[in-house]
């Protein structure tokens, strides 16, 4: 299963087109069947929480001489790193990074086509050279508690991280301004 966040800036129809394009790419790339379930935000949650669950078969689909379709050998996504290495294929970790990049590229293409000035990046803050800390996934149980005004350890952690990241972004703006003034002198 692959879970992807869908841009809330896109309409429902455009989000569906985005997920379907990605699912087709995965099906063609790995020779598997793909099923998609698009979820919209629940009434009590974050109204931007559009996401999709993408299920892939563990076996490849192949058309038999009879015309029927059958599940056959393991797909690349189900192979162990040893099996991948024997076949000269990237490791599971490398493949996951490639899938994340593929998702970012197709999402950014759809955002651009919709004339929306927003982009996503598949890389971590560290890999992007940003001195920002990542937040932790809150999960549905903690989200429900937080919505009721009950603070959770993960929620507290994320609030501290957001404060820190905001301070770091403000510091970067100040440093950039100071550098510009220094260069003018």
Residue ranges of each PLM-predicted region?
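Broad gene-expression machinery/nucleic-acid interaction feature
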Residues: 1, 31-35, 49-53
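Short, Lys/Arg-rich flexible segments
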Residues: 1-3, 7, 24-25, 108, ...
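Glycine-rich, histidine-containing beta strand-loop boundary motifs that form or position
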Residues: 4, 38, 56
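A short, contiguous, amphipathic alpha-helix enriched in charged residues
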Residues: 8-38, 99-102, 106
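Single-stranded nucleic-acid nicking/binding segments centered on His-rich, glycine/basic loops
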Residues: 40-50, 57-185
């Amino acid at each position: 299963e692959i879970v992807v966040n869908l841009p809330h800036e896109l309409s429902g129809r455009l989000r569906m087109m985005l997920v379907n394009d990605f699912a087709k790419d995965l099906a063609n790339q790995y020779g598997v069947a793909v099923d998609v379930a698009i979820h919209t935000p629940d009434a009590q949650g974050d109204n931007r929480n559009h996401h999709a669950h993408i299920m892939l078969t563990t076996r490849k689909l192949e058309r038999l001489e009879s015309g029927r379709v059958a599940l056959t050998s393991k797909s690349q996504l189900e192979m162990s790193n040893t099996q991948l290495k024997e076949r000269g294929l990237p490791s599971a970790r490398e493949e996951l990074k490639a899938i994340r990049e593929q998702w970012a590229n197709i999402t950014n293409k759809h955002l651009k086509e919709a004339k929306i000035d927003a982009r996503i990046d598949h890389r971590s803050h560290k890999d992007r050279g940003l001195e920002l800390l990542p937040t932790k996934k809150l999960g549905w149980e903690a989200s429900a508690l937080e919505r009721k005004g009950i603070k959770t350890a993960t929620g507290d952690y994320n609030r501290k991280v957001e404060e820190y990241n905001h301070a770091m972004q403000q510091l970067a703006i100040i440093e950039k301004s100071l550098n510009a003034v220094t260069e003018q002198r």
